Amino acid sequence: MRKSIIEASLALYRRRVAFRIFQESFCNEVYWNRRQDGGFVLRPGARPSEAVDDIFTNTRMYGTECATAIVIIYYKAVLDMYKPQLFDRAFTRIVLMNWRDMDPLIDPKTYRGLADYLPGDCRYVRNPEVDPLTPEWQGENVIDLGSGRYYGHGIGLGDLDFFISALNRNRREGAQVSAYLVDAATRPDFRVLYLYRKNAS
């Protein structure tokens, strides 16, 4: 699963899905309905597996911000692990926005002060003195790719300093506090996902 998360992150990076704040998000309405809050809801009758894959094939038809990108990565990682038939059975209702709307089967949880952080973890780089005119840069959700590299939608792919520098360019005038990596990680419930696949086989 961790390998699938990394591969989905790199695929999303290569496809160059547009970065948009929630108020300006857009999606392919063949598969998704856009909510007023900027999230995307699977259209009735659409195959979940096809809808998720469409984000990676018709990329120009999608634009969203970094939290939703992580949600997309998680669903794509599970799709690649489960394959379409099982995925379609497991996820009949999908909402792409943030953790609160995720299917309970994935059930991501945030763990603080871990002894070890691992590739595939979702980390957060906080910008505590963000410019109030650009609140979208108050932080960046990133996927740990291993070897000190990260992917974050809207900023790109690089080491931690790359993300800190990008966020520091969007601080308020006179800011004294640098952006920093939060001592926490968000992870799907790998055990539950594994057991669901095992019991379905």
Where are these predicted regions, by residue range?
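Cysteine-nucleophile amide-bond enzymes
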Residues: 1-122, 126-136, 140, 145-201
